[in-house]
């Protein structure tokens, strides 16, 4: 099958990624709806606020042109309850001068003759003099709107004074002027009744009125002008937060990393996001303008449609570039909302400064204006201000498209920035953010902690693709130390040495075996020591050698299984081969392409498939859509994609679930889909990193069948913690530990070389010699037969069977031994004899234990062994036989020892599973201390403290005795390679 290349592949990837973005947005309907229609709700809110403001001023003449004001004739004294802010019960007015009977009569007349209503006596309070009134007012605030002070000077002269609080009050948009509302009614009432009293005519009256000056319409407060910039910024924040969240989610879940391993171009990735977000931005800006016109705002009606639309679209488009850039520094999608709120808060503050005239006035320097204009909300706010000023009065025509480069009407800034200038600023800063986004995306650590040099774009190799594939580890603000070289150690295993010699010979001669898919040449990976500078602290890390020179061939049409405990270097090897991690030393050729060349890596990614350890899937996409996406990324011809997807779904038995979203899949279905993704496009090399983790047995068996069927025509590299899986699927197995290859070969080869020996399982008939039951007497002859001929005892026994471990050095005796045993089956009551090799798990544990023990001898890593006696000792990780200090007795002058049993925990690390019963230490066995004096043991929890009792390490080469019991059950698999003898 011919795959797409060059520009056609770029266009195909772009189309597939664009469709992926469209589907994700379509299926996140709530988020997409808010992004597009948030402007409607904010504009509706502005409309309601504007309507409320207009209603509150409806009775006021301030917003009207008044040429002939209407006079207000003799207004009455209002009830005190009409005052905006008053404490109840209150008084309509208070007065002083109550020692005068004439003054008292005048006040009574004021109360009686108040137009429209008389004032009850309980609503008025009298005092002797103004000082008494002041004292009462200070003690009783907000109880009365005004006071009258009368002084009877003689029979014909009565003077008075009025006391009110002259501060205007405001409540819910309405103003209360005490002069007009309280002072003038009190003044008219006092003068009227004083005049009637002095002339003696109670019916005397005159008309007194007052009116405001003629005035034009006062410019009203427009809600859109005051709160519009903040609301429109909030509208844009919806798309901003969603964009950052989408980018970070793909990075956090390693979805982008998966696409990179499959060969996606960065250009296609960023262009697909830019195009889709640009479309959403254009729709959002269009709807914003249409909603503004629908609510009849002059801002949208008078200004030219393209002028307003372009301002909103360029602003939101600018925020896309800002979101791209900020996403490079954020690692958690949950932080997207926090970042969005912070940008909104900063934008709100800077918009307030911009609305006050800073810095878009001639008194500010161009440098300040340029720096201020880099932040998108600032130029957007200034653009809104210019458009609002152009429609501030009914006579203002707004800004047309042809006059966008001219100074707008009512521009009080000195015309330092026109609408056209704002367009150019928004467009220019978008390209600035976008270029910075691409730059920071390359120099900030990705999900694997890898980044490029900060000067990567200055290197010719980056542009030509021939200068290597140089990347670095660590953050931007970390100082990477020198990488210490890896000391070459000649392998002590003959198979590993033979493999290394063969690869070195091919490398020196420049030969490439046509039957070899992957040739690893001294691959080394060291994480350098770094110094990270943070706030008031400095963190240092030491160099760590993850791979210490790996040499091996992986043949075509074979499945190579890479085993090893946690930290062995399996995943690091895969990450180096797939280009996720840079190699420190050595190289690897995949079908003749070097992983250290960017051109070679580009070719490699076209021919590999990867099933990561954890499912890397979009919950919102179906299984069929996943396969179509990755098929397009791999460059399959468009005409063959549908048929290839149907075939892949059928292979993993997901045809019926192909159109169901992956988020609804079970764990097993997701793993099957991940395997299908790795096999899409018929890759020549497939990496399967623990493909059956967490599967139920039935699903696991089915996935094994899939892997077996797809082995032909390609090479497969498998990592797993399941020894059964490795035994069944692999053609060759390599076991790694501590960054080195410890053994390599077929399963049979490894079992025969590293197993404890042969496993003999003897099954007994239900009755012996017609006794009706199998007692212990019927098994004793068998035990004696094994002990006399092979010097072994059973490691496990019950009334139905016995299990013996026969050392390899007895292999030459087995033929005659089992021939005689088979001849005596009836005598011994034996129903079945099985002979097999040790299990692969035992081989793995032996290799892992040895590596851990070597490491413990260097760094003193210890773990606690709890004995059945209740005591505990510190032992090196991986030690098999341990002498117990302080157990010397007359019966056992050298003390006792135990065999420690090890197993893998759920994370793949070695842990203690139990130990044998205590046994005497034979005289011929040399013993050594696990840690040299003063070395300072460190346990697995990393604690240093008081020195505990340390066990004595016994070399297993000398421990050739037999074992008869343990504190934990140890069973041996009866499946696999075995010979079966039955009567």
From Swiss-Prot:
Domain of life assignment: Eukaryota
Region annotated Disordered, chain positions: 963-983
Keyword hit for Transcription regulation: no
Residue spans crossing the bilayer: 33-53, 221-241, 279-299, 305-325, 339-359, 416-436
Recorded GO MF terms: ABC-type transporter activity; ATP binding; ATP hydrolysis activity
Record flagged with keyword Nucleotide-binding: yes
Location of this chain's protein in the cell: Membrane
SUPFAM superfamilies (alphabetical): P-loop containing nucleoside triphosphate hydrolases
Entries under Pfam families matching the protein: ABC2_membrane_3 (PF12698), ABC_tran (PF00005), ABCA11_C (PF25158)
Domain called ABC transporter: residue spans: 518-763
Classification via CDD domains: ABC_subfamily_A (cd03263)
Keywords associated with the record: ATP-binding, Membrane, Nucleotide-binding, Transmembrane, Transmembrane helix, Transport
GO cellular component: membrane
Family statement drawn from the similarity comment of this UniProt entry: Belongs to the ABC transporter superfamily. ABCA family. CPR flippase (TC 3.A.1.211) subfamily.
Record's protein name: ABC transporter A family member 2
The species this protein was found in: Arabidopsis thaliana
């Amino acid at each position: 099958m011919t795959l797409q290349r060059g520009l056609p592949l770029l266009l195909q990837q772009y189309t597939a990624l664009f469709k992926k973005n469209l589907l994700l947005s379509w299926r996140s309907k709530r988020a997409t709806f808010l992004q597009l229609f948030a402007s409607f709700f904010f504009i509706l809110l502005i409309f309601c606020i504007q309507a409320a403001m207009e209603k509150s001023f409806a009775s006021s003449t301030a917003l009207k042109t008044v040429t002939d004001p209407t006079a207000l004739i003799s207004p009455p004294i209002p009830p005190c309850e009409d005052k905006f802010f008053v404490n109840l019960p209150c008084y309509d007015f208070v007065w002083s001068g109550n020692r005068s009977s004439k003054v008292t009569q005048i006040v009574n007349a004021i109360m009686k003759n108040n137009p429209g209503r008389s004032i009850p006596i309980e609503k008025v309070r009298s005092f002797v003099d103004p000082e008494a009134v002041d004292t009462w007012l200070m003690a009783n605030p907000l109880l009365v709107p005004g006071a009258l002070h009368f002084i009877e000077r003689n029979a014909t002269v009565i003077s008075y004074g009025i006391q009110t609080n002259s501060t205007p009050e405001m409540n819910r948009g309405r103003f209360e002027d005490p002069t007009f509302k309280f002072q003038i009614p009190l003044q008219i009432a006092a003068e009227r009744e004083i005049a009637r009293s002095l002339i003696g005519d109670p019916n005397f009256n005159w008309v007194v009125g007052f009116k405001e000056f003629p005035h034009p319409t006062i410019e009203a407060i427009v809600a859109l002008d005051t709160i519009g910039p903040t609301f429109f910024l909030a509208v844009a924040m919806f798309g901003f937060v969603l964009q950052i969240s989408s980018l970070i989610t793909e990075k956090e879940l390693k979805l982008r990393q998966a696409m990179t391993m499959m060969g996606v171009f960065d250009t296609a990735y960023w262009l697909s996001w830019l195009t889709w977000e640009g479309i959403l931005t254009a729709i959002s800006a269009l709807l914003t303008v249409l909603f503004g016109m629908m609510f009849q705002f002059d801002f949208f009606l008078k200004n030219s449609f393209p002028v307003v639309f372009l301002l909103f679209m360029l602003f939101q488009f600018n925020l896309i570039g800002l979101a791209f850039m900020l996403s490079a520094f954020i690692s958690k999608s949950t932080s997207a909302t926090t970042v969005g709120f912070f940008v909104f808060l900063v934008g709100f503050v800077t918009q307030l400064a911009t609305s006050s005239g800073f810095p878009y006035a001639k008194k500010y320097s161009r440098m300040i204006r340029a720096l201020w204009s880099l932040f998108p909300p600032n130029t957007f706010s200034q653009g809104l201000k210019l458009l609002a000023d152009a429609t501030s009065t009914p006579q203002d025509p707004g800004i047309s498209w042809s006059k966008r480069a001219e100074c707008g009407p009512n521009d009080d800034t000195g015309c330092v920035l026109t609408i056209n200038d704002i367009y150019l600023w928004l467009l220019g800063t978008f390209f600035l953010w976008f270029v910075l986004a691409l730059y920071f995306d390359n120099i900030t650590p990705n999900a694997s902690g890898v980044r490029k040099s900060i000067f990567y774009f200055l290197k010719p190799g980056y542009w030509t693709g021939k200068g290597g594939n140089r990347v670095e580890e660590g953050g931007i603000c970390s100082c990477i130390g020198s990488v210490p070289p890896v000391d070459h150690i000649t392998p002590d295993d003959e198979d590993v040495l033979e493999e290394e010699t063969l690869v070195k010979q091919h490398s020196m001669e420049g030969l490439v075996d046509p039957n070899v898919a992957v040739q690893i040449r001294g691959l080394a990976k060291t994480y350098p020591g770094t110094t990270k500078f943070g706030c008031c602290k400095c963190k240092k890390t030491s160099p760590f050698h993850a791979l210490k020179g790996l040499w091996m061939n992986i043949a075509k049409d074979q499945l190579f299984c890479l085993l090893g405990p946690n930290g062995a270097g399996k995943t690091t090897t895969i990450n180096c081969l797939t280009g996720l991690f840079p190699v420190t030393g050595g190289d690897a050729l995949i079908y003749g392409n070097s992983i250290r060349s960017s051109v070679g890596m580009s070719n490699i990614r076209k021919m590999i498939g990867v099933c990561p350890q954890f499912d890397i899937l979009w919950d919102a996409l179906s299984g069929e859509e996943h396969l179509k996406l990755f098929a397009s990324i791999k460059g399959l011809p468009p005409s063959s994609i549908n048929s290839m997807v149907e075939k892949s779904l059928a292979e993993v038995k997901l045809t019926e679930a192909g159109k169901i979203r992956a988020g609804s899949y079970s764990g097993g279905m997701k793993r099957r889909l991940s395997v299908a993704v790795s096999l899409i496009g018929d890759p020549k090399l497939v990496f399967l990193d623990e493909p059956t983790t967490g599967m139920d047995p039935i699903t696991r068996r089915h996935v094994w069948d899939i892997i077996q069927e797809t082995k032909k025509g390609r090479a497969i590299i498998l990592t797993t913690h399941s020894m059964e899986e490795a035994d069944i699927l692999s053609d060759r197995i390599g076991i790694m530990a501590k960054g080195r290859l410890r053994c390599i070969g077929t399963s049979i080869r490894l079992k025969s070389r590293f197993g404890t020996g042969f496993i003999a399982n003897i099954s007994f008939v239900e009755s012996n010699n017609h006794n009706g039951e199998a007692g212990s007497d019927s098994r004793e002859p068998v035990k004696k037969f094994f002990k006399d001929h092979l010097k072994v005892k059973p490691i496990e026994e019950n009334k139905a069977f016995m299990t013996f471990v026969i050392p390899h050095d007895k292999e030459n005796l087995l033929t005659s031994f089992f021939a005689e045993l088979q001849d005596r089956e009836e005598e011994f009551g034996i129903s079945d004899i099985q002979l097999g090799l040790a299990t692969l798990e035992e081989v793995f544990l032996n290799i892992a234990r040895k590596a851990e023990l070597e490491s413990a001898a260097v760094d003193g890593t210890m773990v606690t062994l709890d004995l059945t006696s209740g005591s505990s000792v510190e032992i090196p990780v991986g030690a098999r036989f341990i002498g117990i200090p302080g157990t010397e007795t007359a019966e056992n002058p050298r003390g006792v020892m135990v065999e420690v049993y090890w197993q893998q925990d759920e994370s793949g690390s070695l842990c203690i599973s139990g130990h044998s019963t205590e046994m005497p230490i034979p005289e011929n066995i040399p013993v050594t201390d696990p840690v040299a004096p003063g070395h300072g043991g460190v346990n697995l929890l990393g604690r240093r403290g008081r020195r505990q009792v340390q066990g004595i390490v016994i070399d297993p080469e000398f421990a050739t005795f037999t074992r008869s019991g343990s504190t934990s059950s140890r069973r041996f698999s009866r499946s696999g390679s075995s010979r079966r003898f039955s009567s």
